[in-house]
A protein has these predicted regions:
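Bacterial N-terminal signal peptides that target proteins for export
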Residues: 2-11
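Structural signature of tandem alpha-helical TPR/SEL1-like repeats
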Residues: 41-53, 75-87, 109-126
């Protein structure tokens, strides 16, 4: 009987521990939302940590990389921002905001020709989206 009680207590504690660790376990999308909120409130270091956590949870989280690129620009880490925005574009070449942000990063770096090419890609993609949206309006 004592062994059964001991096993039951051990099992209960183990189960509670597993449940509690899952309660504090955020998914990648939640980290991105957290990063956005931190950014809105001007807590850029916390935002960066949240975006990095999102990417760690899901290395294919496009919005995690996009947010991280924005933070890197604010920190004047333009090479890192460029890499982050290029990661977004590699995963989704139609992400027009990433093309714009990459152009902005290039402009900050003094790479005018690269900036203009990125802005042109942004304009083409945005124009296509606007055209599609206008056709869908009744």
């Amino acid at each position: 009987m004592n062994r059964q009680k001991l096993f039951l207590n051990f099992f209960t504690i183990l189960l509670m521990g597993m449940i509690l660790t899952q309660c504090g376990n955020k998914n990648s999308k939640e980290y991105v939302q957290e990063g956005i909120e931190h950014t809105k409130q001007g807590r850029f270091s916390s935002a960066k940590e949240s975006f990095l956590n999102a990417i760690e949870k899901d290395p294919k989280n496009i919005e995690g990389y996009y947010g991280l690129g924005g933070i890197y620009n604010l920190e004047k880490k333009y090479d890192d921002a460029e890499k982050a925005f290029k990661s977004v574009i590699q995963m989704d070449p139609t992400h027009f905001n990433a093309w714009y942000s990459l152009g902005y990063t290039y402009a900050l770096m003094g790479k005018k020709e690269d900036a203009e090419q990125s802005y042109e890609k942004y304009r083409r993609l945005k124009g296509k989206l606007d055209s599609i949206m206008n056709k869908e309006k009744p």
